[in-house]
Amino acid sequence: MEWRRPAGTLLRILGVAVAYYATGRLGLRLHVSVEGAVVTPLWLPTGIALACLLWFGPRIWPGLALGTYLSIERISAFDLVDLGIIAGNTLAPLCAYAMLRRVGFRPELDRLRDGLALVFLGGLLPMLISSTTGTWTLVLTGDLPVASFWPVWSAWWAGDTMGVLLLTPLLLVLRRARLPRDPYRVAEAAALAVTVGAVTLTATRSSLSLLFLVFPLLIWAAVRFRLPGAAPCALLVSVLAITAATDRAGPFAGHTLLEIMVNLQALNGAAALTALLLAALVTEQDDIRQKIEEVCEDLAEVVARLAPPKE
């Protein structure tokens, strides 16, 4: 029995490394070059890293380091100074995990406080570590001029944060999600998915300013299907928007790279926050209403027992 525990941990570490590397390759397909540095508007491995830490605990951290190493090898030849990037990409999700555990975060994301904790303690704050160490590593190695620090740093930080906000909730809820039994709900879910894809594709490829049309659909997904419906829709919106931005198509045409990145990350951030926080709020309100109904039923039973019998 003793050998099974280390073997199981080793398999999880290797699985995390493979997942990190695979999603890293997907993210690099949508990369942009900021001041000569390769960055991606949506770095999916950070979402993988935090979700795996919440599932398996901090023991799988070597998988994060190995996955980062493999991702760096994909871009360029590995150098010892790249250990700074590996350290930052490993420490950032570990710090996110520690802070979330500290505040009593629940992976079910069924409370508004859990959604807010994931946004600030899981994404915005800890990803400062990976972006700062990574950008300074490029500066110290001479691969990036000091004057270009802030543009690269901001793009790095935004990409890592979006990976947490868009992918981590999806992974956490899909692990326990179940298909609805009602055929009408299944049909509604299919209609929602098709509509989100069609509207987002149109909005991101049209020269007209139609990006606002995605938000009523995200509200629909959050209200009707909670996070299991809202999270995939937000990720789909983000991927289609990033594809259009890298192609400089639709509303992203004719703009500088800085303008494109600002507009893109504003859209991605707003979509992620709308889906995550609204779904968490609706779920919390449903749970409160259900508990109130249960208390009322229990109270009615007590009153019925204490009431004097009728003559």
What are these regions (language model features)?
Residues 278-281, 285-292, 296-299, 306:
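Heptad-repeat alpha-helical coiled-coil signal-transmission segments
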